[in-house]
């Protein structure tokens, strides 16, 4: 009984801290999780430490009995040990399959026959496979290099100015006319900014046209940030108000449930006095001092705490 009273005092103190943290700005965000965890731990201690839980609720007696059979069953489970056996036959079945494939090809038989021969042969097989892979890579590299050189030879045959046109064509992804850029490069004057959406941001940063710098300039983003920050502050205030309301609801729920548990015990006189003493600390006395039908309705919350 003394342990229960101490647990009730701890719960009342924690709920009182939650209720009083509304005065502090941001106090709920910093301490709400810790205090709620403390409340739940104390609640579990009250239920699990009870020698005869059948007097209060039938739920607590069943919940702690469920996990013990599961814990010894987990290490005894055989899926991990069973997984080690099937892989060897699967690997053995996979090796003979590629054997009929290398018959027309003279390069692969050395690689496929090695797994069944011995420990020294796989080393030579690995070396042969590495050489074959290197030869394949060289062939693919030569083919790719030939593909790259073909357009270069075609462009070099067209004229000396064909090579610089390559990067120019790359720089014109938006379909800009090439004549304007060529003329500007020949005259030596800087090329005017093209009407491409990609170059608008660069022109705005470098101080180009006013029409291009307007959408990408930073001063327009600052008022947006300010306008976004204003509603965010309002949302924070509303969140704090909602959190305070939730804290009040938590106080009413936990306070009524614990007061009901203590009143159901045989020595109800002393515990009712303790509940009335812890009432003003936790919340308003009207929320904790509830009628019997209300306490009956709040019994699911006590089972929820045990399940938690």
Swiss-Prot record:
InterPro entries: IER. Its main location: nucleus. Keywords: Activator, Cytoplasm, Nucleus, Repressor, Stress response, Transcription, Transcription regulation. Induction: By serum and growth factors. Residues 234-243 have a biased composition (Acidic residues). PANTHER family: IMMEDIATE EARLY RESPONSE GENE. Monomer. Homodimer. Associates with the catalytic subunit of protein phosphatase PP2A. Interacts (via N- and C-terminal regions) with PPP2R2B. Interacts with PPP2R2A, PPP2R2C and PPP2R2D. Interacts (via N-terminus) with RPS6KB1. Interacts (via central region) with HSF1; this interaction promotes PPP2CA-induced HSF1 dephosphorylation, leading to enhanced HSF1 transcriptional activity. One of its GO terms (cellular component) is nucleoplasm. GO terms for molecular function: identical protein binding. The keyword Cytoplasm applies. Belongs to the IER family. Residues 63-247, 259-287 are annotated as: Disordered. This is Immediate early response gene 5 protein. It comes from Mus musculus. It is found in: Nucleus; Cytoplasm. It comes from the Eukaryota. It holds the Pfam family IER. Residues 73-84 have a biased composition (Low complexity). One of its GO terms (biological process) is regulation of cell population proliferation. Residues 97-107 have a biased composition (Pro residues). Plays a role as a transcription factor. Mediates positive transcriptional regulation of several chaperone gene during the heat shock response in a HSF1-dependent manner. Mediates negative transcriptional regulation of CDC25B expression. Plays a role in the dephosphorylation of the heat shock factor HSF1 and ribosomal protein S6 kinase (S6K) by the protein phosphatase PP2A. Involved in the regulation of cell proliferation and resistance to thermal stress. Involved in the cell cycle checkpoint and survival in response to ionizing radiation. Associates with chromatin to the CDC25B promoter. Coiled coil: none annotated.
């Amino acid at each position: 009984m003394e342990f229960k009273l101490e647990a009730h005092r701890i719960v009342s103190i924690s709920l009182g801290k939650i209720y009083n943290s509304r005065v502090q700005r941001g106090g709920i965000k910093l301490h709400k999780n810790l205090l709620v965890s403390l409340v739940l731990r104390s609640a579990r201690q009250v239920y699990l430490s009870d020698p005869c839980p059948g007097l209060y609720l039938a739920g607590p007696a069943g919940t702690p009995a469920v996990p013990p059979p599961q814990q010894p069953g987990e290490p005894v489970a055989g899926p991990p040990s069973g997984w080690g056996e099937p892989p060897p036959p699967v690997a053995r079945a996979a090796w003979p399959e590629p054997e009929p494939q290398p018959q027309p090809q003279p390069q692969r038989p050395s690689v496929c026959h090695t797994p069944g021969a011995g420990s020294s042969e796989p080393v030579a097989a690995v070396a042969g496979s590495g050489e074959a892979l290197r030869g394949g890579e060289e062939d693919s590299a030569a083919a790719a290099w030939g593909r790259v050189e073909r357009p270069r030879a075609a462009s070099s045959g067209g004229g000396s100015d064909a090579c610089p046109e390559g990067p120019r064509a790359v720089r014109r992804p938006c379909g800009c006319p090439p004549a304007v850029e060529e003329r500007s490069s020949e005259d030596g004057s800087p090329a005017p900014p093209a009407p491409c959406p990609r170059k608008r941001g660069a022109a705005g940063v470098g101080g180009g046209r006013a029409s291009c710098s307007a959408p990408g300039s930073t001063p327009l983003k600052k008022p947006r940030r300010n306008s976004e920050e204003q509603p965010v502050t309002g949302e924070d205030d509303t969140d704090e108000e909602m959190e305070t309301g939730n804290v009040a609801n938590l106080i009413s729920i936990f306070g009524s449930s614990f007061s009901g548990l203590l009143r159901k015990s045989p020595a109800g006189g002393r515990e009712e006095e303790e509940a009335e003493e812890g009432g003003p600390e936790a919340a308003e006395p009207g929320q904790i001092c509830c009628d019997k039908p209300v306490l009956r309705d709040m019994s699911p919350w006590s089972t929820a705490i045990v399940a938690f």
